[in-house]
Amino acid sequence: EINNIKWEVDMSIPNSKDFFENTIEDFDSIVLFSHVKPDGDAYGSSMGLKLALQGLFPEKKCYCVGSYDEPMPENFEKPIKPGELSIDIIKNSLCIITDTGTKARIEDPRALEGKFIVKIDHHAPDDHFGDLEFVDEAKSSCSVIVADMLFASFPVIPANAASAILLGILSDTDGLKLALEADDFYKVGRLIYNGADFYKTYHSISSNSLKDIELNKAILNATKIEGKVIYTVFN
């Protein structure tokens, strides 16, 4: 029960409880990775899980590797750049790869050199890799799967983890406009009750930079209308 609201235990991700109780416990260090040209869901799922594990298992060393550099609230933690984390750490760690459908799309391929590899994803499972997979292509984002897994075992997660996961969900669902099911809203509610700041997070990913405005202007200026057809031509 959080803030006088009773939340149901989520068991929609099979074996996730065993993952936290056994797999995590076997390692002293954990490294999170995601895909090339990382978007908000790549950041939210990897950094969100890293921060959650860091708070829930304070005796373990947790790292997040990625080049995500899109707008986000100032207090959000930035990942370690690909190639900067010692290969010795990676080889002796549990490596978790999120939001990445194929091996070829892993941003830092050294992730596959980890001692034990876990894949968490919501894309069609065309390329199976790793020692353990949590894949549900019916989910709107990988960050929702991470939230599912965490809430199946922990009623409360760190606020900074909740905020990062929220960013991932909002990013992949265009601010919940593309949410696939009521569960997306339910998970967002739980994240907010765990300390995520909806307004700051939504504002950070929905604000347009001058570069974005200039690009939109160029697209609109190149738009043609013929009858009921609207199209854009770029030279």
Could you say what each language-model-derived stretch is?
Residues H122-V188:
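Short alpha-helices
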Residues W7, S12-P79, S86-S93, S171-N235:
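Hydrophobic helix-and-loop "lid/oligomerization" segment in the mid-to-C-terminal part
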Residues N3-N4:
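Intrinsic-disorder-associated, low-complexity terminal segments enriched in Asp/Asn/His/Tyr and depleted
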Residues K37-P38, T102-K103, F151:
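Short beta-turn/strand-loop junction motif enriched in small, turn-promoting residues
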Residues L49-K50, L112-K115, V135-D136, K187:
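Glycine-rich, phosphate-binding/catalytic loops in enzymes
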